[in-house]
C-alpha cells in the first residue's frame, strides 16, 4: 500500500476524544488530525515524537488530515490506521505473500456469517476447497519486543473467536490473522494481563481447529505492506 499523495510529518502534541489529535507542523503551526484508531493505543502515544499524516482532497470532511504512522523514541514505526489492516491483507493475498492462504479463486469482504450477527473480514472460496473464513486483527501493542492483542478488554474480539470456533465446528477453515503494524514487534501473544478471557478463548480456539497466523509489516513514510510471518505464542 503506497501513501498517495505523500505523507507529511509533524510532532504529536496530544490525542483526545479518541478520534482527534493535535499536531505541530515543521513551521510551528498546529493542526487537528483525525485519529483512525478506536483502541486504547497503549504504548503507541509519544508526545513530542514525529508522526505522519495523510491529507484528503474531500472538502466536505471536517478534518482533512488523517494520522497514519507514529515514530517511537527508538525509531520504530507504528501503523496507527487500524482500518488499513483488511486492505493490507487483501493486497498480500492477491500477491501470494501469505503462503498459508494461497490457492483460492475468490475473495469477498464483510460477508455475514456465524450465529452472533457478525461479518467476516475476508472470505476465501474455491470449488476444490472448503471455504476459508479470515478474521483480521491489527497488533500494535509492544512490550519488550513482544506484541500483544488486544490492548484493552475486547468483547468484540471475544465474539469473533467464538464465531471462528463455530465455523471450524461446521467443517470450514477458520483463521485468525494478526497484522503486525509495529516494526519492533517480533512475535505475537494474547494479552492475558489485559484481557484474560480473550487469552483463554484463543487457546480454546486453537484446540477447536482455528488457525492463528501473524504477519509483520514493512513500514515507511512512503508505503506499508505485509512482509513476512512471525511466531504466535498462544
Swiss-Prot record:
Domain of life: Bacteria
Coiled-coil residue windows: none
GO MF, any single term: DNA binding
InterPro entries xref list: SfsA, SfsA_C, SfsA_N
Pfam families xref list: SfsA (PF03749), SfsA_N (PF17746)
HAMAP family attached to this UniProt entry: SfsA
NCBIfam families: sfsA (TIGR00230)
Family the UniProt entry places it in: Belongs to the SfsA family.
Protein name stated in the entry: Sugar fermentation stimulation protein homolog
Source organism: Shewanella oneidensis (strain ATCC 700550 / JCM 31522 / CIP 106686 / LMG 19005 / NCIMB 14063 / MR-1)
Gene designation: sfsA
